[in-house]
């Protein structure tokens, strides 16, 4: 119920026939039926390129423009989504290197993720091994920095040696998971 998959001429890679505004509205309506107000859509650069090439998005813009010609660009696409649907488009462009050293996108080219306003979850700090060890050791000097980085300093004798260990346990939570909607717009 939080996932919609487009097929055939509805896919956003079919620039002549696709209607991304109507598809986004369908997802927004599904969320509203559950009491969720969506505020943002995360997409890849390739998806943004498909939106720029969409004839229906161009027609939405032309319908509000007194001139017969427009230059379609990312800013116009973002503007029409904001004005028509109150959705901010976020293009996620970051890459990582895979095991073969090739650049890979974090965000897939086939998906659009719709998000509500605000935080999707929290960070929770757990008891780290250093904290646990400090509870039972009198020889360790343990301090906590910022929100959960633990620093343990121990002294060893013969030979004289100072050992410093740093650790932290951070666990993400996803309380707003039921407020996130996915649209698979391309194969």
Q: Predicted regions span which residues?
A:
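A structural signal for short, well-ordered beta-strand segments and their strand-loop junctions
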Residues: 39-44, 90-92
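Alpha-helical scaffold segments that mediate packing/assembly in large oligomeric complexes
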Residues: 1-33, 42-62
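Short, well-ordered loop/turn elements at secondary-structure boundaries
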Residues: 35-37, 160
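Sequence/fold signature of self-assembling virion shell proteins
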Residues: 3, 7-9, 15-18, 58-187
């Amino acid at each position: 119920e939080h996932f919609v998959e487009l097929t055939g001429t509805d896919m956003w890679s079919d620039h002549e026939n696709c209607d991304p505004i109507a598809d986004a509205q369908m997802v927004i309506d599904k969320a509203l039926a559950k009491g969720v107000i969506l505020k943002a859509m995360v997409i890849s650069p390739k998806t943004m390129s498909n939106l720029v090439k969409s004839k229906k998005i161009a027609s939405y813009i032309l319908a509000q423009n007194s001139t017969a010609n427009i230059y379609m660009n990312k800013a116009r696409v973002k503007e029409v989504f904001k004005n028509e649907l109150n959705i901010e488009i976020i293009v996620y462009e970051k890459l990582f290197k895979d095991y073969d050293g090739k650049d890979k996108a974090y965000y897939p080219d086939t998906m659009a993720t719709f998000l509500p306003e605000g935080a999707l979850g929290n960070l929770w700090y757990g008891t780290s091994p250093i904290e646990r060890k400090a509870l039972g050791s009198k020889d360790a000097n343990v301090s906590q920095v910022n929100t959960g980085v633990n620093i343990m300093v121990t002294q060893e004798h013969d030979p004289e040696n100072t050992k410093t260990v740093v650790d932290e346990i951070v666990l993400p939570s996803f309380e707003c998971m039921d407020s996130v909607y996915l649209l698979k717009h391309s194969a």
